[in-house]
Amino acid sequence: MIKAIIGKIIGTRNDRWIKQYKKQVLTINALEPTYEKMSDDELQNAFEELKKRVRSTEKDLQEKTLLEVLPESFAITREASKRILKMCHFDVQLIGGMVLNDGKIAEMKTGEGKTLVATLAVALNALKGESVYVVTVNDYLAHRDSKEMEPLYHFLGYSVGTITASVRDDDERLEIYSKDIVYGTNNEFGFDYLRDNMKYSLEHKVQKSHAFAIVDEVDSILIDEARTPLIISGPVDRRMENYNKADEVAKSMQVEIDFTIDEKNRAILITEEGIKKAENLFGVDNLYKIENAALSHHLDQALKANYLFFIDKDYIVANNEVVIVDEFTGRLSEGRRFSEGLHQALEAKEGVSIKEESQTLADITFQNYFRMFSKLAGMTGTAQTEATEFLEIYNLEVVSIPTNLAIKRKDLNDLIYKSEKEKFDAVILKIKELHDKGQPVLVGTASIEKSETLHALLKKERIPHTVLNAKQHTKEAEIIKDAGLKGAVTIATNMAGRGVDIKLTDEIKELGGLYIIGTERHESRRIDNQLRGRSGRQGDPGTSQFYLSLEDNLLRIFGSDRIKGVMEKLGLKDGEHIESKLVTRAVENAQKKVENLHFESRKHLLEYDDVANEQRKSVYKFRDELLDVNYDISAKIAENREYALNQIFSKLKAFDHQNLSEEELLGLKNILKEDFNAHVSLEDLKKASPIENFVAEKLKSDYENKMKVLDSEQRSRIERIVYLQILDNAWREHLYTMDNLKTGINLRGYNQKDPLVEYKKESYNLFLEFIEDIKTEAIKTFSKIQFENEQDSSDAERYLDNFSEEREHESVTYRHEEALDEDLNVAMKAFAKTPKRNEPCPCQSGKKYKDCCAKSGPKKGLFAK
């Protein structure tokens, strides 16, 4: 109450921001007459002067200089837009541009010209000479926006490029990223960052800096997509028959007897009866024994697939494949797969071919990718409901920009029916009424399944209509553009053509504009607001109303009993509804509960990913150092050699290494031969004094003699490439181990331990192990390098010539590793292959290598006779 009173007196924080920006608008407008009088050449020269001024400033002071030149830059950009695009930035659009430049989120309603607003901040920040990224949700918008704005940017002396999934050629991508302004999707930018950190040359990295990015539809990308990490992966061996068996077992189990469903948390809890049934069907005595861990995991995923995930809602089956439907946009997520074996479980459920599970080679969340930018800004029509999350996670403030014209759309109260059938009957009646009148109507549904239901009902009533869901996503822009035509009836899932305007004729405006019908409240208020926002653009008339039922998921799972109680007291007859602000508020409270659950889920994901992110940054930084031709890789190898020898001598019993027994010396001799390909006699070891210096000098001289056939450039390149391969392989194994750790860490909660604290502690220890593994593996590999012909360097030349940089998402990444091993065999011959940490130990103990000889040395031992 007090806060509201103070707000009315001094204005809200948003009001105060807008007031400050309006002062700048006056300054910009005062410059307009000056630039209007200039010729094109004079205007371009004036902008070039701004570039020189900013770029001649010290880097640390460039942001300050940008603020100083902002009025001139905005005024020139506006004048150029008038001449080139025949579009003039409104005052509110100038405010939007300033919000973006300040690294904030500009909340602008549909039709307010966000694409044009972005040009102001883009043109200003590109003055620094670093590429500016404009991020969109799909290839269509990236291509459309870049092509529409390109003439303006060219006039200002900027080059423009567009990154889409269709750009496959590495050289072409490199060329596009060299442009001043780069448009692209969040997925492409994120994957390119991961691919950059799998490259073997700094010159081949496409993203040179992360200076400034403007994220269009920022709520969709930074909120809705935040729970889905970007992953580049390669296949991993799994027994495919386990998925089908687990699916059979899951289908035979009964709800409430063998398992219970927690719909709020989307979880399955197996009962004691269910465990016994599963053990009987799998033919095992204890489902939760370590050796049956894979079976219990497959069963968990099969139960989720069968009882929590539904066809035409969470996924569709197309071309013998299970394709995910994005829950927020309603679009098909081509190429994306559910993790942890869930996708395979869905494939088994639907009887399509099961694709093998994959192992992570590189991954990052959008949260951590976009937080790398020195300055980040965003645009959307709906951000205030998530303002807390934007601030807490991304340090982004949300500023609501006033509309250019007052909003005339009427947002009516929700109508609530007892059953879904009654609700849809009422929706059909309303559509028929509007269609007969000629007023266009856009009907929003929460899933493909519901859009198909509505389609069938309209077909039965012979009402012509168009359906837009994930199955027709290729026609999205065309369908949405036509949604404002006279008599048009359009059914759309959540996708509803974001970024595509629905323009109305004067005749349609006279009829009342576009009528929005929502057939279900989404879990997020923001998605509902997006649907409403399709109507009433640029001061157009319009109406929106939601039709709900007590059988809707949101009300059934999260809605309070209060709504149900009200309806029962009123004694509503079939087909009757209630309409009240009290009920609408209760629905919004249910939405807030779900939004909070999702926020906590995203925060939880980020807390875990932050741990991995620190490790990722450390590894990628070291990787860049290795790629630098000035980095002293030979010194790093010498350092690793010293470390490896210290590890060996630290295991020797005797404190005084000069008094080693013959048994110990023999053990040392064997280790030197097996691990370092160093041939020393027992007599030499006995005579050596001090023995550590003798061994160190022996390993060093062997290596230097081997590398004599190479010139300094060849040697440096060979050493860097081999070291990079060792690092990449170790990182891949580390990610695999981290995935396994994360999968089981929540079980620590049953032992009264905080899973996150345990994860941080164990992941830190794993990272230390990872670093040690690199050091020891590096020196072993370099010690075993042997050129086929030690009299010339042709093998090395052949290796360097054949070394391929081709990487293309998952499969190419995996193929590249196979090709790399083959090339290494052409140029070098290793005398022994050290098993990977998770491979079976060669001593045939039955344990993994990391739990056996990796710790204690080979079974014949350091002190073997």
Curated annotation (Swiss-Prot):
Broadest EC class assigned to this enzyme: translocase
Membrane topology: Peripheral membrane protein
EC number(s) stated in the UniProt entry for this protein: 7.4.2.8
Subcellular location: Cell inner membrane; Cytoplasm
Domain of life (superkingdom): Bacteria
Binding residues for ATP: Q93, G111, E112, G113, K114, T115, D501
UniProt-annotated binding residues for Zn(2+): C841, C843, C852, C853
Pfam families, per the entry: P-loop_SecA, SEC-C, SecA_DEAD, SecA_PP_bind, SecA_SW
Main location: membrane
Cofactor: Zn(2+)
GO MF annotations in UniProt: ATP binding; metal ion binding; protein-exporting ATPase activity
SMART domains registered for this protein in UniProt: SecA_DEAD, SecA_PP_bind
Entry's family note: Belongs to the SecA family.
Function: Part of the Sec protein translocase complex. Interacts with the SecYEG preprotein conducting channel. Has a central role in coupling the hydrolysis of ATP to the transfer of proteins into and across the cell membrane, serving as an ATP-driven molecular motor driving the stepwise translocation of polypeptide chains across the membrane.
Description of how the protein assembles with itself and partners: Monomer and homodimer. Part of the essential Sec protein translocation apparatus which comprises SecA, SecYEG and auxiliary proteins SecDF-YajC and YidC.
Name of the protein described by the UniProt record: Protein translocase subunit SecA
Annotated source species: Helicobacter pylori (strain ATCC 700392 / 26695)
Phylogenetic classification of the source organism: Bacteria, Pseudomonadati, Campylobacterota, Epsilonproteobacteria, Campylobacterales
